[in-house]
Swiss-Prot record:
Functional note: Catalyzes the attachment of proline to tRNA(Pro) in a two-step reaction: proline is first activated by ATP to form Pro-AMP and then transferred to the acceptor end of tRNA(Pro).
Taxonomic lineage from the root: Bacteria, Pseudomonadati, Bacteroidota, Bacteroidia, Bacteroidales
Catalytic activity: tRNA(Pro) + L-proline + ATP = L-prolyl-tRNA(Pro) + AMP + diphosphate
Record EC number: 6.1.1.15
Gene designation: proS
Protein name: Proline--tRNA ligase
Similarity section: Belongs to the class-II aminoacyl-tRNA synthetase family. ProS type 3 subfamily.
């Protein structure tokens, strides 16, 4: 049964199917009755809650507060920012009526034709328009600035080709929307939030990222600049994991949001927006997991430790229960989250397989011999190694091990990225190497035409213009025209 529980398609056989198998079998999420929408199951949601809690703390540490804005946006609002509406028009879900009625045929319900809305409503794909319409009422003077708001919400972008967590019609996210008196302050905010995302990705998700700026083609609709963090998955594809946008005065002008400065002169407000979504769940799964199941960084695991008793009779179980309770209390006193699984409906072998599949970082197993010797077996999920250790100071042993696992998972992902990042100078070499996956650093002439040609011919996109990259100028690999620095290419999710 334990083998059946864990039967995942190997990554080498089909990475896509492995991912799908893992999300389902590890009880993270499943498809719903609504096409393109997912059910996030309790175990998956527990991971998302840990992400949410940590990010929320980081937002508040940088001066942000939470608010909530409507799910529905009047269609006319989207029309006010031309680039913005063009970017989202094909993905919008539209509400046209406000009532149902009983079917005259007696079969279920139908839309009441008398209940047509005067103005159609858009189910939010993102909230810039509704928020800036609101900010107009909040901002009169420089004393009202800055506004530093974040919203935790769901959004809808009608996707035809969906994958659990990575691309769904409805997803959960946070979106920050800030208003500032100066361009410099807004630009600083956009960069600050990029740093917050990068810190979260690397220190909590144990996922190395490249920080950069998007090209004009890849920029958020309505933004002046889009900053991004890009991660490399185990199949050699990039995953955009968070974005922060400097919006200039575009939305302030669209909604006529002005303020009086210290001299009484009126000017348009400067803006940013920034967000991450449940897509991070997909990034977390694909960054670290293996053919045995999830590998979770301890900082985001719902439980960091699971304790499993191994016993022959009720007397042994009672003795192990007593000792396990002491261990659990000692670990929790150190801030370590623990689950003691003494359920009698599954054998230890099944439990080992289940918690390995679910990526619990540390497994402790205790049997009768351990009771006699004052020892316990300790197994780590990241390396699948185990050893028997003394119980004295077990909380220190586990705390040190969790810290080591967090660092090891990050280092492993970093090593993978280093091994799969190359530099090329010729377009012929680029076309050959892109088939192997990974990041490619190459010179580009800065034009949309060249970027579109590369995408059409190779399916690779410019993931970002790295902020801390190789600033040596050169010649575009396609046209030979001057290039100020290398940019990061990859095929992407």
């Amino acid at each position: 049964m334990a083998k059946e529980l864990k039967e995942l398609t190997p990554r080498s056989e089909s990475y896509s199917q492995w991912y799908q198998d893992l999300v389902i079998k590890a009880d993270l999420a499943e498809n719903s009755a609504v096409r393109g929408c997912m059910v996030i199951k309790p175990y998956g949601y527990a991971i998302w809650e840990k992400m949410q809690r940590q990010l929320d703390d980081m937002f508040k540490e940088t001066g942000h507060v939470n608010a909530y804005f409507p799910l529905f946006i009047p269609k006319s609002f989207l029309s006010r920012e031309a680039e913005h509406v063009e970017g989202f028009a094909k993905e919008c879900a539209v509400v046209t009526h406000y009532r149902l009625k009983a079917n005259p045929d007696g079969d279920g319900v139908v839309v009441d034709p008398q209940a047509k809305l005067e103005e159609e409503l858009i189910v939010r794909p993102t909230s810039e328009t509704i928020i800036w319409n609101t900010y107009k009422n909040w901002i009169q003077s420089h004393r009202d600035l800055p506004i530093l708001c974040n919203q935790w919400a769901n959004v809808v972008r009608w996707e035809m080709r969906t994958r659990l967590f990575l691309r769904t019609a409805e997803f959960l996210w946070q979106e920050g929307h800030t208003a500032h008196a100066t361009k410099e302050e807004a630009e600083e905010e956009a960069r600050r939030m990029l740093e917050v995302y990068a810190t979260f990705a690397e220190e909590y998700m144990a996922m190395p990222v490249v920080k950069g700026v998007k090209s004009a083609n890849e920029r958020f609709a309505g933004a002046v600049d889009t900053y991004t963090i890009e991660a490399l998955m185990q199949d050699g594809k990039a995953l955009q994991s968070g974005t922060s946008h400097f919006l200039g005065q575009n939305f302030a002008k669209a909604f006529n949001v002005t303020f009086a400065d210290k001299d009484g002169n009126r000017d348009f407000v400067w803006a940013t927006s920034w967000g991450v979504s449940t897509r991070l769940m997909g990034a977390l799964i694909m960054s670290h997991s293996d053919d045995n199941g999830l590998v979770l960084p301890p900082k985001l695991a719902p439980y960091q430790v699971v304790i499993i008793p191994i016993y022959r009779n009720e007397e042994q179980l009672a003795q192990i229960d007593e000792k396990a309770t002491q261990i659990t209390q000692a670990l929790r006193a150190k801030g370590i989250s623990v689950k003691y699984d003494n359920s009698d409906n599954k054998k230890p072998g099944w439990k080992f397989a289940e918690y390995e599949l679910k990526g619990i970082p540390v497994r402790l197993a205790m049997g009768a011999r351990d009771l006699e010797n004052n020892t316990i077996e300790i197994a780590r999920r990241d390396t699948l190694t185990k050893e028997t250790v003394g119980l004295d100071g077990i909380e220190e042993t586990v705390a040190t091990l969790l810290d080591d696992i967090q660092k090891n998972i990050f280092q492993k992902a970093l090593n993978y990225r280093k091994e799969h990042t190359i530099t090329v100078d010729s377009y012929e070499e680029f076309k050959e190497k892109i088939e192997d996956g990974g990041f490619i650093l190459a010179h580009w002439d800065g034009t949309s035409e060249t970027e579109e040609r590369i995408k059409a011919e190779t399916k690779a996109t410019i993931r970002c213009i790295p902020l801390n990259g190789d600033m040596t100028p050169g010649k575009c690999m396609v046209t030979g025209k001057p290039s100020p620095q290398r940019v990061l290419f990859a095929r992407a999710y």
